[in-house]
């Protein structure tokens, strides 16, 4: 069997891309960058997609919070107007991937009924128009629910997935979804009120009113943040650019020593979503040296995020 061809697209996500508030100029600039990534993906024409993505207490909860999980079946929950319903997950390929990762000494959970949110489906919809357009293996990386594992294990996960993908004889696109610096209003075990605690621990479904209230709160938090008010940690463009330089230049081993507390202190609690980028780039790097092509970055307070996009192929 011929060796697989692997390509990469990493991009930030934001529910605010689908909500009122951001300036049209900002949305137009991001749409232009996404269009370039979409053209890259269309030209590559993947036969299989592997997503590395976080969750925002929509599919994974403290009742059992794995560091990593591979889905053999998955459904979008439809949050913030994103895709609701099943994804096209090839269960046999996903199971084989999980088995290969375990054989590479990386402990990964398996889900035969994974729920995924905008962190997974928004990039699929932006790149393909439809979240079900391509067969996809979803890989969850806990990036929110502390305590978090060491970054070096994320790189090991990506490398193990990449080593397996190389054996499939397919054109495979790996997607990393999230980041960069940002600190949105996310409940924690220490601070969540009772209703939110029931959700993040037990997965108690949100009512329609609760979902609407959360959406309104996110819009208001972004409005305050963009105007320089509120209590959210500021974006850190310098940190973002330093991280992008690391992935652009293939110096992935440098992240192995990063301290989790340092990441949150420098770039916000949800900056840990860069774990998805690290895993995706590690999967690509398992094929050899690579070069990044489409490069976009903008600090976007209106999205409460340092918003970035990268595409890459092996050389």
From Swiss-Prot:
Active site: 118, 182
GO molecular function: 3-carboxyethylcatechol 2,3-dioxygenase activity; ferrous iron binding
One Gene Ontology biological process: 3-phenylpropionate catabolic process
Annotated catalysed reactions: 3-(2,3-dihydroxyphenyl)propanoate + O2 = (2Z,4E)-2-hydroxy-6-oxonona-2,4-dienedioate + H(+); (2E)-3-(2,3-dihydroxyphenyl)prop-2-enoate + O2 = (2Z,4E,7E)-2-hydroxy-6-oxonona-2,4,7-trienedioate + H(+)
Biological pathway: Aromatic compound metabolism; 3-phenylpropanoate degradation
Signal peptide: none
Pfam families: LigB
Top-level taxonomic group: Bacteria
InterPro entries registered for this protein in UniProt: DHPP/DHXA_dioxygenase, Xdiol_dOase_suB
UniProt keyword annotation of Cell division present: no
Enzyme class of the recorded protein, top EC level: oxidoreductase
Enzyme Commission no: 1.13.11.16
UniProt keyword Calcium, yes or no: no
Cofactors: Fe(2+)
Keywords: Aromatic hydrocarbons catabolism, Dioxygenase, Iron, Oxidoreductase
Function as written in the Swiss-Prot or TrEMBL entry: Catalyzes the non-heme iron(II)-dependent oxidative cleavage of 2,3-dihydroxyphenylpropionic acid and 2,3-dihydroxicinnamic acid into 2-hydroxy-6-ketononadienedioate and 2-hydroxy-6-ketononatrienedioate, respectively.
HAMAP family recorded: MhpB (MF_01653)
Family: Belongs to the LigB/MhpB extradiol dioxygenase family.
Description of how the protein assembles with itself and partners: Homotetramer.
Protein name: 2,3-dihydroxyphenylpropionate/2,3-dihydroxicinnamic acid 1,2-dioxygenase
Origin species: Mycolicibacterium gilvum (strain PYR-GCK) (Mycobacterium gilvum (strain PYR-GCK))
């Amino acid at each position: 069997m011929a060796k697989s061809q692997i390509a990469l697209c990493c991009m930030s996500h934001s529910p605010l891309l689908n909500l009122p508030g951001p300036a049209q100029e900002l949305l137009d600039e991001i749409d232009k960058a996404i269009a370039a990534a979409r053209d890259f993906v269309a030209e590559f024409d993947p036969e299989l997609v592997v997503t590395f993505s976080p969750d925002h207490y929509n599919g994974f909860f403290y009742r059992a919070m794995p560091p990593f999980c591979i889905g053999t079946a998955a459904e979008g929950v439809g949050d913030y107007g994103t895709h609701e319903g099943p994804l096209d997950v090839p269960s046999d390929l996903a199971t084989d991937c999980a088995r290969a990762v375990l054989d590479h000494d990386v402990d990964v959970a398996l889900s035969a009924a994974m729920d995924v949110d905008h962190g997974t489906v928004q990039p699929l919809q932006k790149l393909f128009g439809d979240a079900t357009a391509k067969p996809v293996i979803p890989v969850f990386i806990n990036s929110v629910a502390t305590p978090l594992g060491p970054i070096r294990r994320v790189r090991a996960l990506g490398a193990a997935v990449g080593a397996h993908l190389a054996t499939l004889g397919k054109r495979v696109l790996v997607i990393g979804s999230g980041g960069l610096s940002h600190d949105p209003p996310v409940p924690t075990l220490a601070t969540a009120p009772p209703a939110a605690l029931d959700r993040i621990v037990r997965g108690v479904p949100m009512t329609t009113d609760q979902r609407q209230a959360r959406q309104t709160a996110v819009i208001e938090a972004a409005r305050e943040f963009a105007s320089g008010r509120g209590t959210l940690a500021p974006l850190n463009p310098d940190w973002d650019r330093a991280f992008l330089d690391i992935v652009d230049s293939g110096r992935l081993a440098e992240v192995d020593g990063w301290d989790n507390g340092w990441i949150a202190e420098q770039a916000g609690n949800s900056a840990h979503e860069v774990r998805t980028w690290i895993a995706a780039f590690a999967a690509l790097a398992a094929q050899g040296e690579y070069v990044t092509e489409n490069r976009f970055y903008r600090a976007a307070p209106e999205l409460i995020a340092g918003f970035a996009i990268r595409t890459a192929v092996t050389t």
